[in-house]
């Protein structure tokens, strides 16, 4: 039976591990290193270099050396963060045929999944060299806050690399698995994962082989690359003051600056001062120029103070969602190379009120956890159960543009949730299901993941057809959505594709905006619900008047019509209380219509009375509480649901 390898596909470095007996072993690459730079280069002769060889020649081949590709995975080219990234890297980021952000090297275009696949192939070859056999299956890790598009793109990268991806596992969860496998007893742990490009924090409960994620939060555009960029900017600004030349405009100099910034950052974790010395960094008419700048630890900490502070809010949110206090956390696990920075350790200690656990290697622990999960899936590791969560809420757009959640964030996966919706127009034969991901109350404020049509619904009055919408999230965090007409059994489904996924910036923006606009969202939702209630009441009352108005008398009919006109006059306004008041007035008036109908029933008797009673059902506006009015676009007609 072939081995399942565990791969930590990182922004800056990647790592591969495999189970040997009861223990996971990190495998050294051909260069004798336990981690491999996540870099790919294309040389002038057409050769492709991956890992350390690519990093070694980066300075002399800046435009064809690709790094930090993980930050582009699942992102659209028009994303503002993509535009920002274009100014930070010496290689070219271009628009792919599907509108995604791709990269260009030696006149050829590559998708981020392709470039990631080159790195995965290197890890696969490393494992095969050690094991002496072919490897076809892997567990690959992703940041916990990765969206559906990014997870799908990572799985695609595995397929391109010739690997069957048995599971996509969240990085903090993998780290917890590696930490807690041999631990006895129960406890609550926090995993603080600050890597090269992303930040995650997860709270887990561990006990008797069960690893249950209680909550996760993060920032998918915060990591070592941002710290490097701050140092690069500082060095470039200092050089410009001295020499009047902006090194950021020179791609060759930019690559040398990046290399020097990363080296200085690492050195300042163990020393208080370092010297950045780059001879012949550039030249002008007067001759060659050299860069020589001293950088202290305190200066570095000042440069990145806000970046470090940005990790605190997700920690607060994760604790709140998990329902625990910082003092109730038994252990804090540090993951990712950036956690070696003394300032980071200081902030973690200050927030959680305890020294973080330093017994795991932050560069290797994620790959080890992935290998353990591979062992679990193969049956080599017994009595281990992993329960992960989905990071963002999922739902559809319903009447008035409201975002109706079917699956809340931090729901344990795999999960399946169904809800029954109905039509917004009489005789509507088709509906459009629009799928969203986010935390805002209005669908338009969240990100649309995709949409699909359900056609062939038998014509019926609005609110009568029953359309069951089902969300299904698998153990990889990948989403399937289906819609089924319960009368005909007709069904349509969609697997959310990467091209419709969220960008890193969108997720970060959504959560932060949700917090800032919580009160505003609540008010807008209340207004929409009041309008929907009013609209439904007007519809049923007008229908009842049409059918039974002659039995109510001219005076009552006139009074009801007056109330309908008054409600219509305020319905499009923003005064919730006015809409509620006029709705209540119309309800009182329509109740009198019901009384008149009952009297007519008693007088008439027989079959005619029965028909009138059926009409009263319409007047009261009662319906199945489980049916939610939904906003659907009619596909093969002129009408649209409002």
UniProtKB/Swiss-Prot annotation:
The modification Phosphothreonine is found at residue 198. Pfam families: HSP70. Residues 602-642 are annotated as: Disordered. Keywords: ATP-binding, Chaperone, Nucleotide-binding, Phosphoprotein, Stress response. InterPro entries: ATPase_NBD, Chaperone_DnaK, Heat_shock_70_CS, HSP70_C_sf, HSP70_peptide-bd_sf, Hsp_70_fam. Residues 603-613 have a biased composition (Low complexity). Induction: By stress conditions e.g. heat shock. One of its GO terms (molecular function) is ATP binding. NCBIfam families: PRK00290.1, PRK05183.1, prok_dnaK. Belongs to the heat shock protein 70 family. Acts as a chaperone. This is Chaperone protein DnaK. It comes from Paramagnetospirillum magneticum (strain ATCC 700264 / AMB-1).
């Amino acid at each position: 039976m072939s081995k399942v390898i565990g791969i930590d596909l990182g922004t800056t470095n990647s790592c591969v591990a495999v189970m040997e007996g009861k223990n996971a072993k990190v495998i050294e690459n051909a260069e004798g290193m336990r981690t491999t730079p996540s870099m790919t280069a294309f040389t002038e002769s057409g050769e492709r270099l991956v890992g350390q060889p690519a990093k070694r020649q980066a300075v002399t081949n800046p435009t064809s050396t690709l790094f930090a590709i993980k930050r582009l995975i699942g992102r659209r080219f028009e994303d503002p963060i993509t535009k920002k990234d274009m100014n930070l890297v010496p290689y070219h980021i271009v628009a792919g045929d599907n509108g995604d952000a791709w990269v260009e090297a030696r006149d050829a275009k590559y998708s981020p999944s392709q470039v990631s696949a080159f790195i995965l192939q290197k890890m696969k070859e490393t494992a095969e060299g050690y094991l002496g056999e072919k490897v076809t299956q892997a567990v690959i890790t992703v940041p916990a806050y990765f969206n559906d598009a990014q997870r799908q793109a990572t799985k695609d990268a595995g397929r391109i690399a010739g690997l069957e991806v048995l599971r996509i596992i969240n990085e903090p969860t993998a780290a917890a698995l590696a930490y807690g496998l041999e631990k006895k007893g129960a406890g609550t742990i926090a995993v603080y994962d600050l890597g090269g490009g992303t930040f995650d924090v997860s709270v887990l409960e561990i006990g008797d082989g069960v690893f249950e994620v209680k909550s996760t939060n993060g920032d998918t555009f915060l990591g070592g690359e941002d710290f490097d960029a701050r140092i690069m900017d500082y060095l470039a600004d200092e050089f410009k003051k001295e020499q009047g030349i902006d090194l950021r405009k020179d791609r060759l100099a930019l690559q040398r600056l990046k290399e020097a910034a990363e080296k200085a950052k690492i050195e300042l974790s163990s020393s208080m001062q370092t010297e950045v010395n780059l001879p012949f960094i550039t030249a002008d008419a007067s001759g060659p120029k050299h860069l020589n700048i001293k950088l202290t630890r305190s200066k570095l900490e000042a440069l990145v103070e806000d970046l470090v502070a940005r990790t605190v809010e997700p920690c607060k949110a994760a604790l709140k969602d998990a329902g625990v206090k910082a003092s109730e956390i038994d252990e804090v696990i540090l993951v990712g190379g950036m956690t070696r920075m003394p300032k980071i350790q200081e902030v973690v200690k200050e927030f959680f009120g305890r020294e973080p656990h330093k017994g795991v290697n932050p560069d290797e622990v994620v790959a080890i956890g992935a290998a353990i999960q591979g062992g679990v899936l193969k049956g080599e590791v017994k009595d281990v159960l992993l329960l992960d969560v989905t990071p963002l809420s999922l739902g559809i757009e319903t009447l008035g543009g409201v975002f109706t959640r079917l699956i809340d964030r931090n729901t344990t996966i795999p999960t399946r949730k169904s809800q029954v919706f109905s039509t917004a127009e009489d005789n509507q034969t088709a509906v459009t299901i629009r799928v969203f991901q986010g935390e805002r109350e209005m669908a338009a404020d969240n990100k649309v993941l995709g949409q699909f049509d359900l056609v062939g619904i038998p014509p019926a009055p609005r609110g009568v057809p029953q359309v069951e919408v089902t969300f299904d999230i698998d153990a990889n965090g990948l989403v399937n959505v289906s819609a089924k007409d319960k009368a005909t059994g007709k069904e349509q489904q969609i697997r959310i594709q990467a091209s419709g996924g969220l960008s890193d910036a969108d997720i970060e923006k959504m959560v932060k905006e949700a917090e800032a606009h919580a009160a505003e969202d609540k008010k807008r939702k209340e207004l929409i619900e009041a309008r929907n209630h009013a609209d439904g009441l007007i519809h049923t009352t007008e229908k009842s008047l049409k059918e039974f108005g002659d039995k109510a008398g001219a005076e009552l009919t006139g009074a009801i019509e007056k109330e309908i006109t008054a409600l219509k006059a305020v319905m499009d306004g923003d005064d919730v209380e006015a809409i509620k008041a006029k709705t209540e007035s119309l309800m009182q008036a329509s109740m009198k219509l019901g009384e008149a109908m009952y009297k007519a029933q008693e007088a008439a008797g027989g079959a005619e009375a029965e028909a009138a009673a059926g009409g009263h059902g319409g007047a009261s506006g009662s319906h199945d509480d489980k049916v939610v009015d939904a906003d659907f676009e009619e596909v093969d007609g002129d009408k649209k649901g409002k």
